[in-house]
């Protein structure tokens, strides 16, 4: 299964993604309400392990990742970072991990809850991306991948959607 998290409009999704989507894909996109930010309450770890306690339609994002082989994120660049919508959803994926810490590559990281190893592709888009923004986005993507227990990550940058958005086949 692929988890595809994006902040595209309905029109952009239809024009650039529709022909590449599979029936088995789990699409995480904007709903009528924006996702609420993670409260850091530990509820997804101790009250409802693997599921966020905030019931707003985005509570299962960590569990979706636990059943996925691929995680594709399409985000507008916002000052060298994920867009606010994407950032909130990524933060809510913390239930993908256990609350316990392990050392990986000399750094402290959460222990993985699931045994899968994600293949991650991040596609940032935006007009006039600066070198500084690209450096920040590259570092942020790699750090996120390490936190999710993988080093299998590809990061791409699009100045426009001409030529389309290429997902893995």
Where are these predicted regions, by residue range?
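N-terminal beta1-alpha1-beta2 submodule of the flavodoxin-like/Rossmannoid cofactor-binding fold
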Residues: 1-71, 75-98, 146, 157, ...
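Short histidine/acidic/glycine/proline-rich micro-motifs that form metal-
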Residues: 77-79, 126-131
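Short, acidic/small-residue loops that bind anionic groups at enzyme active sites
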Residues: 93-108, 149-155
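Glycine-rich anion-binding loop/nest that anchors nucleotide
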Residues: 73-74, 97-105, 121-126
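Short, conserved loop/helix-junction motifs that constitute active-site signature segments
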Residues: 111-119
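A generic local structural motif
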Residues: 57-60, 106-110
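Glycine-rich phosphate/pyrophosphate-binding loop and the adjoining helix
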Residues: 128-169
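Short beta-strand segments enriched in small/hydrophobic residues
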Residues: 1-7, 120-128
């Amino acid at each position: 299964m692929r988890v595809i998290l994006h902040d595209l409009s309905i029109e952009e999704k239809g024009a650039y993604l529709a022909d590449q989507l599979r029936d088995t894909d789990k699409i995480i996109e904007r709903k009528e309400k924006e996702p609420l930010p993670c409260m850091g309450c530990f509820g997804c770890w101790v009250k409802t392990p693997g599921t966020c306690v905030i019931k707003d339609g985005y509570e299962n994002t960590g569990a979706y990742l636990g059943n996925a082989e691929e995680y594709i994120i399409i985000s507008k660049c916002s000052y060298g970072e994920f867009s606010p919508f994407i950032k909130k959803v990524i933060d809510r994926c913390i239930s993908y991990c256990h609350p316990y810490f392990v050392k990986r590559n000399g750094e402290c990281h959460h222990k993985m809850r699931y045994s899968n190893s994600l293949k991650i592709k991040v596609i940032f888009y935006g007009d006039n991306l600066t070198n500084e923004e690209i450096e920040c986005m590259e570092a942020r993507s790699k750090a996120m991948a390490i936190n999710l227990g993988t080093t299998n990550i590809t990061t791409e940058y699009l100045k426009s959607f001409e030529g389309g958005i290429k997902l893995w086949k």
